Amino acid sequence: MIERATEFEAIRSALTGDGPVGAVLTGDAGVGKTTLARQATAAVGGNVRWVAGTESARSIPLGVFAHMVGVYTAHDPVTFMSAAREALLADGPIIIGVDDAHLLDQLSATLLLQLAIDRAARIVATVRSGVQVPDAVTSLWKDGHLLRIDLNPFSQRQSVDLVESMLGGQLEGFTANLMWESSGGNALFLRHLVEGALEAGSLRQVNGVWQLRGRAAVTSELAALLEDRVEQLPEPVLRVLELLTFCEPIDLEVMAELAGEEAVEAAENRGVIRVVENSHELVVRYNHPLFGEVIRRRLGIASARRLRGRLYSALSERPINSAADRIRLAELALDSDKSADLELFEAAAADAIGLANLPLGERFARAAVERRGGVESADLLARALLWQGHRIEAERTLASFDPDQLNEVQLARWGSTRVSNLLWAMGDADRADEVLALVRSKVSHPKIAAILTGLASACAVNENRIDDAFDDAESVMNTEDAPPWAVWWASFGGGLALALMGRGEAARQYAQRGHDVESHIDGLNRFMSTHAEVLALTFTGDMEGARRCATAYFGYSAPGQYLAWGMSKILQGTVDVAQGRFPDGIEHLEQALAALSTEGAAAWMFPARLRLAEAYSALGRAGDAAEAIAGATERGGRHSAVYEPQLEIAKAWLAGAEGTITPAIRIAMNAADAAARAHQHAIEAMALHTAARFGEHSVAGRLADLAAKVDGELVQVQARHAVALAAHDGPGLDAAATEFERIGALLSAADAAAQAASAHERAGDRRRLLESAATANRLAAACGGASTPALRQAAQPLPLTAREREIANLVAAGLTNRQIADRLTVSVRTVEGHLYRACIKMDVTDRESLAALLRGETPP
């Protein structure tokens, strides 16, 4: 039961207080009136009697109370009510619950009103909104005898809670949006939607997250409930609903033309449709989306084809003003009794892919291929397929064409999609390079060649050839009137290269060039250049700018746009982790990985898993971090070599979470060296700063040099942090913590504050020690309960050397001396020597007592 605390308390107070003698709950069918009313009466306790109004009992005087009153033959209403009242009150104080009080007969309603007026019983009743109600029932709340409580549908958060309680697991945010919109927050509808989707197999659990893929299913029980309302509608209104089923929303003029103005007005008056303004035009929508599913079930195949044909004929005579208009027309043509030309399906496929609705784009592209479309249709089909994980079919579709038979425009289009599929979906960098080289050798037109040069930049950056990526991108950006796809490929390849090089300002300029042409680019591809922009902003320390950029592409609501939704979650999770908002980051990234479970999105799962590993490590969840790193490593290769230094940083954080500080520092330093060799100076700075946060004092000089190369204030603060750490400068570390917090890098701030506390302790300054420790604790809490090496050391100051502390932590984690020696690459005798000295300093007699002390337990 999803609690409605405010309403529940209002009912309980009314049933026990000195004011009204109860409450009446009003609301639409299925919003949870009865459930809440019964829960409230059960909580109050005592003698509770429930009755329910029905259509069949409405014609029987005192029909709902008949089973309580017993057999009575009097025909005088006054005598009849007196006997009923006596029977109801015979057992003392009573709470009378009346479900569907709007269906009470007049005598029952009058009896209920008299009991309320006389305060002879406590009453709780439910009434459906929008229906005729007996006057006596209305008087219950109008005259103040009962408290009226209007029960609204569930909010989206309440709807998610309800569905998750039914499923026993986490619900995907994208699915939550779809279900909430389909149900309108109606608890009854939600329950049936979940049951119907489970039965149909469209609601399934992936990586622990429940996802809805495809149309929302309707159970037979819910269909029957809704059909009762549908069957009561006159024929003209039904015609309106039937047309709307296949074309929602539809222009009001078109609907009036097809169904008649009077029918449309009647449908609106009955509350089954609504007329709303959309882009300065009036359109017709269902008042409740599930009506469309019920109407769809009632129609046969022939009727549905005929209705689609009527709609297609009407809309094809009107101008196409948007991609949505074209997509709607193509959808109607697909399964209608009318025919449409190849050009419509190709254009609609491009529109759908541009809007990131890949399943729909695939349908249109297949229709174009079936109508003997050439390489253009095949290219559209492959673009839709590769992102959905059908990489083999995409390759087979494109490989069936002989490049020698294609003109240069076709070659560029065919080659770009095939290279994309081979590199990012299939992970075959060698084959991708071969195809790209083949196509480039056959193209001579400068503008077409620019597209392939831009593509070469994108390939180079993924293969960690940073300088090549930048050079190719610069060539495109300096080409006058370069085609949109050329500019976009260059904005991604060059933009990511610049971000990694630490040239954040130039990367943002590249990103803007990409934004200028993004209307020409496939919907999901836009995330590639946006990801580069988000990284550039976080590397420079512009966290608010990164947040704005990451949330710019969040308006995805169609069922087929789940991959775009997942990509947007990666962007948001990336910013969350950079800011230290780890619980939010973990939720966003885990949901993204579940949504992007298809092989077509494999390239984007790599960086997502790295961010996830960092988040888990920061919270001390080493097992989860190790799992994320293993998942990333499985998908590694030359096609994702650009992320190798960041993978090593994630491994360093994992080692830190496991308490092995020496290996953690070594891994971080190796990551810095690898990044330096690749000219990834922003990543080099990140790796060096990671080592400093683990306690490495030797990185100040390198970070100072990088501060002169890398844009933004973040690296400046990192450099000052490293200098203060090496000098055991407590005030300097406090200042670094303040600067990190101002920037929005909360975990860096927490680590700097924790190291400041240790420095103040070393200097014997207890006041500042306490202040810095309090700051570190506050920031760690803001990060979701962070547990880093610096924070752990500040929270538990011990008279141990760094190596002794490291080995003691591993003992506390349950490792044997041999396992510790293997992990730290030292001898067992060395481990034993450090343990011996640690036990003496901690005044314990053996390793078990030392382990207990480190875990905060009482030594045995």
Predicted features along the sequence, with ranges:
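Start-of-helix signal in alpha-solenoid helical-repeat scaffolds, especially tetratricopeptide repeats
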Residues: 305, 309, 323-330, 342, ...
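Alpha-helical sensor/transducer elements of the RecA-like P-loop NTPase core
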Residues: 107, 114-175, 182, 189-192, ...
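Short secondary-structure boundary elements
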Residues: 29-31, 47, 158-166, 170-363, ...
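Internal alpha-solenoid helical repeat scaffolds
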Residues: 77, 102, 140-141, 171-173, ...
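Conserved phosphate-binding/catalytic loops and adjacent sensor/switch elements of nucleotide-binding enzymes
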Residues: 26, 31, 35-94, 103, ...
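Extended alpha-helical scaffolding segments used for macromolecular assembly and cargo binding
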Residues: 22, 36-40, 261-263, 283-286, ...
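N-terminal pre-P-loop "Q-motif" helix
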Residues: 1-14, 80, 803
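Helix-coil-helix junctions within alpha-helical repeat/solenoid scaffolds
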Residues: 19, 397, 405-409, 503, ...
